[in-house]
A protein has these predicted regions:
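Extended terminal
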Residues: 1-13, 17, 41, 53, ...
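Terminal hydrophobic membrane-targeting helix
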Residues: 17-90, 96-102, 119-121, 454
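Amphipathic hydrophobic-ligand
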Residues: 46-48, 66-76, 103-118, 133-142, ...
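Flexible, solvent-exposed coil segments and beta strand-coil junctions
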Residues: 66, 94-98, 110, 121-124, ...
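Transmembrane beta-strands of outer-membrane beta-barrel pores
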Residues: 69, 95, 134-136, 159-161, ...
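Outer-envelope beta-barrel architecture signal
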Residues: 85-87, 126, 151, 191-195, ...
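Outer-membrane beta-barrel and related beta-rich outer-membrane complex signature
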Residues: 209-211, 377-384
Length: 504
């Protein structure tokens, strides 16, 4: 029995001696360093690893590694206990070219990275504390790990350059600006992160050149912005409050909820466009005035729904966009104000309501407009009619009117009906082509039994106006002839006048 115990004791001493010689002697350190170097250098060709210093003993660690002769990683620390793996280290990282790690992280990286701090370990639990100048920022961080699993993260980034961050991640530089980010995240028992992360972008500016290159969409104006986002992470949900202030528009999104698993999104929003003329290059329509919209956004794996309401042209507008279909309703607006917003001639004053359905993909839809108590405004068109007919159309009040239109890819086919107590204006199959900017319509006008027609042709902005007064002249002559016939006693003259009347 004593021999057996002695053999075991000698064996343990031998194993410990081998272990000590392998890990804590100069020969052992040299062997391990060469093994690590060869392992890294043989498995990849992106960079070469070489240790300038590799010292490990029972109390201290001192490592200096060169990466491609231009970058260095230094680790210097004290081993307090081998049995519970308790140690404290100071590290310094200076990477001149992050692209050497592209294959390892499966992501294109650019730029440089400098970081330094402390690493404390015990029983597989580690805390990494440090600072960095990533993207020319002032960054502080604290990461707690259980072996290699992140348990908590405390990150504070101040004044990082947006363009440098995007370049570091090898993303197109869509924007310039200063990024601030503060995150405090803790992993829960369900292996999800909970906590708050706040970020803002100050002095943001869109990079027009990159936007044109990436999206083939030229932007002429300078777009500046500031963005602030307050976020809470609860398991798989992100709860956010976002405020965007820009030279184009302001946007508030409160109670934004994003499910990171299903990608579902829900939020309310408030959109404030201060000057509609500034968005002309994005919508290809010159508009006047401003626009404020309040609504909701809901998206799931099957559908996208956006609704909103606004006060437009003195009326109330409501819309619902469900996937590709847009339903728009406008009630009790003023037509003059609406024409001003649409940057069109203010030729008709009335109370106006409309109901429209439009598919934004097929570009097919319909629009029905109802007007009440309307009258034409004196303009060149009305004056030309008056010159031909001696009738002032602007004095007529049309109590009711309807315009029913079909939309087919910027082509509109319409029927018009305006009625007053004694008059009416009708048009059938009127045609407007916004692509070619042309109009082709005929208005049949009956003003207190004075009948004539007006054709509008060619250029939509300055159409050719053709007034057909044949029916009007006929009606006037018939009235005159009837007057003479009723006064005439001579039968032969009466027959002559009737013969003349029959010519019309």
């Amino acid at each position: 029995m004593k021999k057996f115990i002695l053999i075991i004791f000698i064996f343990v001493i031998f194993i410990f001696g081998i272990f000590y010689m392998l890990f804590f002697t100069k020969i052992g350190n040299s062997t391990i360093s060469k093994y690590i170097e060869n392992s890294f250098n043989e498995k990849q060709n992106d960079f070469k690893l070489k240790f300038d210093t590799f010292i490990i003993d029972t109390n201290n660690i001192n490592l200096v590694a060169n990466i491609n002769d231009s970058s260095k990683v230094k680790i210097d620390g004290k081993i307090n206990s081998l049995f519970d793996l308790k140690a404290e280290f100071i590290y310094k990282i200076d990477i001149k070219d992050l692209s050497i790690f592209n294959n390892i992280v499966q992501k294109e990286l650019k730029g440089s990275l400098a970081a330094n701090g402390d690493l404390i370990t015990k029983n597989g639990l580690s805390t990494i504390i440090g600072t960095s100048n990533i993207a020319n920022s002032s960054t502080k961080y604290e990461i707690n790990l259980n072996k290699t699993d992140i348990k908590s993260l405390d990150l504070d980034i101040k004044n990082a350059n947006m363009d440098e961050l995007l370049a570091l991640l090898s993303e197109p530089i869509y924007s310039f600006g200063k990024l601030n980010l503060n995150a405090k995240l803790i992993k829960n028992s369900s292996n999800f992160f909970n906590g708050d992360f706040l970020f803002d972008i100050n002095d943001g500016k869109i990079n027009n050149e990159i936007v044109q290159k990436e999206f083939n969409f030229p932007i002429k104006q300078t777009i500046t912005y500031n963005l602030k986002s307050l976020n809470k992470l609860e398991n798989t949900n992100v709860l956010s409050d976002i405020k965007l202030i820009s030279s184009l528009a302001n946007l508030d999104m409160k109670n934004l909820i994003i499910d990171l698993v299903t990608k579902d999104i829900s939020s309310n929003y408030f959109l404030d466009i201060l000057n509609l003329r500034q968005i002309e290059e994005f919508i290809n329509i010159a508009l006047n005035g401003d626009l404020k919209v309040v609504g909701n956004i809901n998206k799931n794996q099957k559908t996208l729904k956006i609704d909103g309401n606004s006060n437009i042209a003195g009326g109330v507008a409501n819309f619902v966009l469900l996937d590709d279909n847009l339903d728009l309703k406008l009630k009790d607006a003023n037509s003059l104000k609406l024409l001003y917003i649409l940057n069109k001639d203010q030729f008709f004053n009335s109370n106006l309501s409309l109901d429209s359905n439009y598919n934004i993909v097929s570009k097919i839809g319909n629009i029905n407009i109802e007007v009440k108590n309307g009258n034409f405004i004196k303009n060149n068109f009305i004056q030309k009619i008056e010159d031909f007919t001696k009738i002032d159309l602007s004095k007529e009040i049309f109590e009711y009117g309807a315009i029913n239109s079909k939309i087919d890819n910027k082509k509109i086919y319409s029927n018009l009906n305006l009625t007053s107590k004694k008059s009416d204006i009708k048009s059938k199959d009127s045609f407007i082509d916004f692509n070619k900017n042309i109009i082709d319509t005929k208005l049949d006008i009956n003003l207190n039994k004075n009948i004539f027609s007006v054709k509008l042709e060619d250029d939509l902005n300055k159409p050719k106006i053709i007034v057909d007064v044949q029916d009007l002249i006929k009606n006037i002559l018939e009235k005159k002839l009837d007057k003479y016939i009723n006064k005439e006693d001579d039968a032969q003259k009466i027959e002559l006048l009737k013969g003349i009347k029959s010519l019309f």
